Amino acid sequence: MSQIIRDMTEIARCGAQYKADRLSPMGLKGCHASYLTEICAHPGISQDQLAKRICINKSNVARQAATLEEEGFLTRTPSATDKRIMELHPTQKTLDLLPEISSVLKEWETCITGDLTAEELDLMAALVAKMKSRATDYMDGR
């Protein structure tokens, strides 16, 4: 494995632990931040659409959505056009917590990028976007 991939993987693992530590007092797991921020940004998103947007397999999304529903963070309702499709909506509980969740994500970003210059941040953002595009192209082609 290349050093770049190792480093990116390690950063992702550290970020997951950071989110888990900060979100657990809210009753959330670290992985739930990406689910809830997307659901709040796109109320009514289907489980399949969410899986594609956050690059998680459909069965994991279904499992986590069920957990989040049980805990009162979202509702799952069958689509009016296709009862097999489950649409996800944030609850008021989630909407109330969204600023805190967003703050945790911003804190992590600041933690790992705080000593980078504006030019370094711009370059990194462009390079990461390029890599993400290739990664999502792979996922779309599966």
Give the ranges of each region predicted by the language model:
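Residues within helix-turn-helix
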Residues: 47-48, 59, 66, 86
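Key DNA-contact positions within bacterial/archaeal DNA-binding proteins
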Residues: 31-33, 59
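N-terminal leader segment of winged-helix/HTH proteins
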Residues: 1-26
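Central "turn" residue of the DNA-binding helix-turn-helix
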Residues: 43-44, 55, 117
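Short, locally clustered residues in the helix-turn-helix/winged-helix DNA-binding domain
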Residues: 9, 37-41, 102, 129
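The alpha-helix within a helix-turn-helix
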Residues: 51
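Charged, amphipathic alpha-helical coiled-coil/dimerization segments
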Residues: 16, 66-129, 136
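Pre-recognition alpha-helix immediately N-terminal to the DNA-recognition helix
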Residues: 7, 14, 18, 34-37, ...
